Swiss-Prot record:
Gene3D superfamilies: 2.30.42.10, Guanylate Kinase phosphate binding domain, Helix hairpin bin, P-loop containing nucleotide triphosphate hydrolases, SH3 Domains. The keyword Ubl conjugation applies. It is found in: Cell membrane; Postsynaptic density; Synapse. It comes from Danio rerio (Zebrafish). Residues 610-786 form the Guanylate kinase-like domain. Keywords: Cell membrane, Membrane, Repeat, SH3 domain, Synapse, Ubl conjugation. Residues 4-60 form the L27 domain. Its main location: membrane. It is a peripheral membrane protein. One of its GO terms (biological process) is receptor localization to synapse. Ubiquitinated by MDM2 in response to NMDA receptor activation, leading to proteasome-mediated degradation of DLG4 which is required for AMPA receptor endocytosis. This is Disks large homolog 4. GO terms for molecular function: ionotropic glutamate receptor binding; protein heterodimerization activity; protein kinase binding.
């Protein structure tokens, strides 16, 4: 029960009576206690005690429910929030408050329960676990942050999946600016924290049980969480969101479009825990810059009549790009920014809205983005203790790109493992599957001893909603990966040594890449054991002695054998295609049989650079722009060369490599030092092999190249093997759907160019993508780049079929 002033007075009277009758030792101890009771400090503490009781009573009579021991909030309209800095939250020689037990208000370790929304001025006590003296803080800022803060005590029961959250920060690795606090970076779906529902992303942890983690290293905080036991009490500080003002803007597009960049969206958060679409850049001279009202940090709530709340990033991009000349924006402006612009480094995944610039502005439009300190991979450690090793049930809803993960294994009963999670795919968005998971069953089908083919079939035929029983087994997967690496090394060595002999002998194994789609059900007279495949699939041929059918197997993206059977021979493919063309009244160009392509021989190679990317076909410019603006940490552009004189505001090596003599550049072009070059306004412009290599090797980025298909072979000759992706339109209407701003005549010309491009350069393509919309095509392009980034890739072999 709380201490009353009248109780103290009765205690003093009793102590004085005992003092006169007791022995000498008792009298000495009683005098000390009386001195304490009569001191000014003790009287002040009694005053504070009465103040709090009065406040509690007023709040209770006003009908406010008290939740003792659970939430501690401070919302002081008169005084700014505490400064959350270890120097100001120390337990040193600060004013000490005596915490007295109260069964009604302090059930946990004698912590005094303060009522929510208590108005205490001018100072506020920081609540600490028992044994720690609170400090009366009068500072006004939390590491440079404005706005209100709140404190909360959250008790979690560690479950099978641990505590269910990830952390970042610490004195050795600050997460936000120079703040050493331990921040929550992710709430794991289905975990203890998610089920409790109170812990939020960006909360900072002050204490774990009785352990102070306000100014500690990251590893210390990790150990504190691991050693906290089955019941864990977290004392967290949270920065309350600022108020927002909703406003309507009208922008009129100019030569530079709307003139701003955005970031964010579902599955692509700009601010952790927030799916909003944020303005990240205002382009000078653009419509937004001239209007002057839109600012960095504003949220875009709607574009014209389309709301952008809880939408994918691609949907927001499409909404802004598919607008007319007059655009109405509904914008939320934050009245008080919590974070300094440079203090917080979320993923800079943005999309800009400006049309293509003329040749003189080309370098500025596609200049390499400066490296960002933030990685899309959270800097926080996902605690091993929080990753359950027990079997768990996961439900995945199949998306437009399938389930969004690859599998390996299935030989000699070794199990089926997840080897790759596609960024933005169904598995990635669920957050419940990870590399190293073993799949035990799919929709009730036991896969513990399944072959790779059986597992692939079970996943393919599982329907839209797939229930997976999986178990995290990283050690087994690591051993499996090591085995795959050894096999890959043997594969690379054997393919190089025996490639020439393989082609001469019908009994030797070799590798080919398919240059066409093959559907066995559409092939009249097909074998029941035939294997269907798509353009770009790699096949291992075991026996090519038969003139019509080769015994072969299809390889999965990571090199393991996926399916075996028979494929049509080169002779069969070319004969059937020749007959088809003649039936349609078309002859191969100049009567050449090499016009018809079937397979090319390939060998596996290991690369130690980011492969350049060449997009070909309709909408290639839009794809290039979106990749550069959306993922500046992964994609870059190289600096071109020119013989044009340098302008006053330009810098050599940043805007262009300015070549002093036209003769020198012509000589370099003839020496094959350029992958492409041309003339504009009597000046030479070109992209050199060295410029591409600098982006690929030194910056470690995929160099986006706006070049013709001829550049593919030149890059291959320079040992820089690009990812060349052809966007294949299926019809005139498909072109119009992909590029909505084209007229019908422009779309027809684009279709004709695409058909000719495929005829002339199909063997140069790494992959062919198709789709009903630009968004679908863009998603496929990103998937291809992800799969073919390396380090192990298939490259053309010197030997020909």
């Amino acid at each position: 029960m709380p201490l009353k002033r009248e109780d103290t007075e009765r205690a003093l009277q009793a102590m004085e009576a005992c003092q006169s009758a007791g022995d000498e030792g008792f009298r000495t101890r009683a005098e000390r206690l009386l001195t304490i009771f009569q001191s000014d400090l003790f009287q002040a503490l009694l005053d504070i005690q009465e103040f709090y009781e009065l406040t509690v009573f007023e709040n209770q009579t006003a009908g406010r429910a008290l939740t003792p021991g659970l939430k501690y909030r401070y919302h002081d309209e008169e005084t700014p929030p505490l400064q959350h800095s270890p120097a100001h939250l120390s337990t040193g020689k600060s004013a000490e408050m005596l915490h007295l037990g109260d069964s009604g208000h302090a059930p946990i370790d004698g912590i005094h329960a303060y009522t929510p929304q208590m108005h205490v001025s001018p100072a506020k006590p920081v609540l600490l676990p028992s044994g720690h003296a609170p400090y009366y803080a009068t500072s006004t800022l939390m590491n440079g942050m404005d706005g209100d803060v709140e404190y909360e005590e959250i008790t979690l029961e560690r479950g099978n999946s641990g505590l269910g959250f990830s952390i970042a920060g610490g004195t050795d690795n600050p997460h936000i600016g120079d703040d050493p606090s331990i921040f929550i970076t992710k709430i794991i779906p289905g975990g203890a924290a998610a089920q409790d529902g109170r812990l939020r992303v960006n909360d900072s942890i002050l204490f774990v049980n009785d352990v102070d983690v306000r100014e500690v290293t990251h590893s210390f905080a990790v150990e504190a969480l691991k050693e906290a036991g089955p019941i864990v009490r977290l004392y967290v500080l949270r920065h309350k969101p600022s108020a927002e003002k909703i406003t309507e803007l009208k922008l009129i597009k100019g030569p530079k479009g709307l003139g701003f960049s955005i970031a964010g969206g579902v599955g692509n958060q700009h601010v952790p825990g927030d799916n909003s679409i944020y303005v990240t850049k205002i382009i000078e001279g653009g419509a937004a810059h001239k209007d002057g009202r839109l600012q960095i940090g504003d949220k875009i709530l709607a574009v014209n009549n389309m709301y952008l709340e809880e939408v994918m990033h691609e949907d927001a991009v499409a909404a802004l790009k598919n607008t007319g000349d007059v655009v109405f924006l509904r914008v939320a402006k934050t009245l008080h920014q919590h974070h300094h612009q440079d203090a917080y480094n979320p993923p800079d995944i943005t999309s800009s809205y400006s049309p293509h610039m003329d040749m003189s502005d080309y370098p500025q439009a596609l200049s390499p983005s400066s490296p960002r300190r933030y990685s899309p991979i959270p800097k926080g450690l996902f605690l091993d203790d929080d990753i359950s090793r027990e079997p768990r049930r996961v439900v995945i809803h199949r998306g437009s790109t399938g389930l969004g993960f690859n599998i390996v294994g299935g030989e000699d009963g070794e199990g089926i493992f997840i080897s790759f999670i596609l960024a933005g795919g169904a598995a990635d968005l669920s957050g419940e599957l990870r590399k190293g998971d073993q799949i035990l069953s799919v929709n009730g089908v036991d896969l513990r001893h399944a072959t790779h083919e059986q597992a692939a079939a079970a996943l393919k035929n599982a329907g839209q909603t797939v229930t997976i029983i999986t178990q995290y087994r990283p050690e087994e997967y690591s051993r499996f990966e090591a085995k795959i690496h050894d096999l890959r090394e043997q594969l690379m060595n054997s393919s190089l040594v025996s490639a020439a002999a393989s082609l001469r002998s019908g009994k030797r194994s070799f590798f080919i890449r398919a240059l066409f789609d093959y559907d066995k059900t559409a092939d009249g007279g097909f074998l029941s054991q035939a294997v269907s495949f798509r353009f770009g699939d790699v096949l291992q041929v075991f026996d090519c002695s038969d003139e019509e059918w080769w015994q072969a197997g299809k390889l999965a993206p990571h090199g393991e054998l996926e399916e075996t059977g028979y494929i049509p021979s080169k002779r069969r493919v070319e004969r059937k295609e020749w007959s088809r063309l003649k039936t349609r009244g078309r002859e191969p160009v100049s009567g050449r049989s090499d016009y018809i392509v079937s397979y090319e021989t390939v060998t596996q190679s290991e690369v130690h650079y980011a492969r350049p990317v060449i997009i070909l076909g309709p909408s290639k410019d839009r794809v290039n722009d979106d990749l550069l603006s959306e993922f500046p940490d992964k994609f870059g552009s190289c600096v071109p060369h020119t013989t044009r004189p340098k302008r006053e505001y330009e810098m050599d090596g940043r805007d262009y490599h300015f070549v002093s003599s036209r003769e020198q550049m012509e000589k370099d072009i003839q020496s094959h030092r350029f992958i492409e070059a041309g003339q504009y306004n009597s000046h030479l412009y070109g992209t050199s092999v060295q410029s591409v290599r600098q982006v690929a090797e030194q910056q470690g980025k995929h160099c986006i190249l706006d070049v013709s298909a001829n550049a593919v072979r030149r890059l291959q000759a320079a040992q820089l093997y690009p990812i060349a992706i052809f966007i294949r339109p299926s019809s005139l209407q498909n072109v119009l759907n992909i590029s909505k701003r084209l007229t019908e005549e422009q779309a027809r010309r684009a279709l004709d160019r695409a058909v000719k491009l495929e005829q002339d350069f199909i063997e140069c393509f790494s992959a062919i993508v198709e789709g009903e919309s630009f968004e679908e095509i863009y998603h496929h392009v990103k998937s291809v780049i992800e799969e073919q980034s390396g380090p192990y890739i298939w490259i053309p072999a010197r030997e020909r079929l």
